[in-house]
């Protein structure tokens, strides 16, 4: 992991270890923020990347070090019955299903990033600024949308969500459940590893974001207001594939203006659309 991520994890775990908590306890309480396996935490402590050492851990010093494999793999249990093949099977059985694609757009590594939500049918895209690329921040946004739209509208807009294997999307059960009832607001599926083309519609729209926020640029000084403004310009941009209508107009035709207002979307007149970095220059 990069230095910023290690600093972020260190900020979470070191104070708690100094209060006498075990890594296991801390991991259970902060799994969504930590974004790594419990084993990785021990590896980082061994490598002396944190403010704490093995001697600080309540029980670690009593144990003889085990044989270490050269590397470990992230648990992909979350993908069971949610693979791309399962997605295609589901669409075969439910051909009328509206598809939503979800992804992240990264700013400066370790800094603020975006969660993007793309409605394939209308090409409308929502984007949300997040302080860190964690699964907790993704779940928070889905909960917020559920609240703003209401259960009925949310269910009709988000029957299925296709996303990639990023660790920020590795808690599907929390994304799918409304309060305590499992699988009752959406169904999460994953693209095959290294197959971004499987959610190509989303990737194409990211090219428009990159016209305004070029790769490598920092999002740290931006606000959600900036991101909403950018998406209003992108969603008002007419597309050939939509019969020369904009995503805003197309989405409005399917779901009505009221839903767009609740999502924070506003139209921008064609002659005022700017898809260059100067749109967000302060």
Residue positions per predicted region:
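Secondary-structure boundary/capping micro-motif
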Residues: 1-218, 222-223, 229-232, 237-240, ...
């Amino acid at each position: 992991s990069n230095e910023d991520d290690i600093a972020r994890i260190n900020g979470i775990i070191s104070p708690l270890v100094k209060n006498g908590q075990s890594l296991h306890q801390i991991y259970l309480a902060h799994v969504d923020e930590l974004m790594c396996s419990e084993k990785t935490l021990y590896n980082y402590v061994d490598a002396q990347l944190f403010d704490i050492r093995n001697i600080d851990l309540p029980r670690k010093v009593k144990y003889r070090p085990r044989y270490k494999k050269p590397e470990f793999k992230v648990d992909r249990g979350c993908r069971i019955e949610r693979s791309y093949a399962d997605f295609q099977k589901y669409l075969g059985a439910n051909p009328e299903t509206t598809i939503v694609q979800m992804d992240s757009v990264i700013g400066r590594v370790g800094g603020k990033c975006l969660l993007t939500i793309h409605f394939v049918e209308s090409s409308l895209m929502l984007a949300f600024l997040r302080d860190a690329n964690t699964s907790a921040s993704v779940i928070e946004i889905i909960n917020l949308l559920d609240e703003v739209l209401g259960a009925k509208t949310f269910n009709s807009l988000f029957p299925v969500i296709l996303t990639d294997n990023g660790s920020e999307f590795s808690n599907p059960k929390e994304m799918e459940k409304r309060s305590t009832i499992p699988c009752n607001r959406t169904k999460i599926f994953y693209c095959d590893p290294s197959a971004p083309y499987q959610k190509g519609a989303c990737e194409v729209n990211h090219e428009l974001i990159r016209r305004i926020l070029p790769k490598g640029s920092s999002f740290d000084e931006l606000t959600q207001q900036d991101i909403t403004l950018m998406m209003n310009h992108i969603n008002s941009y007419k597309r050939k594939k939509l019969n020369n209508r904009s995503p805003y107009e197309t989405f409005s035709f399917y779901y009505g203006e009221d839903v767009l207002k609740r999502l924070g979307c506003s139209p921008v007149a064609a002659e005022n659309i700017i898809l260059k970095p100067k749109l967000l220059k302060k």
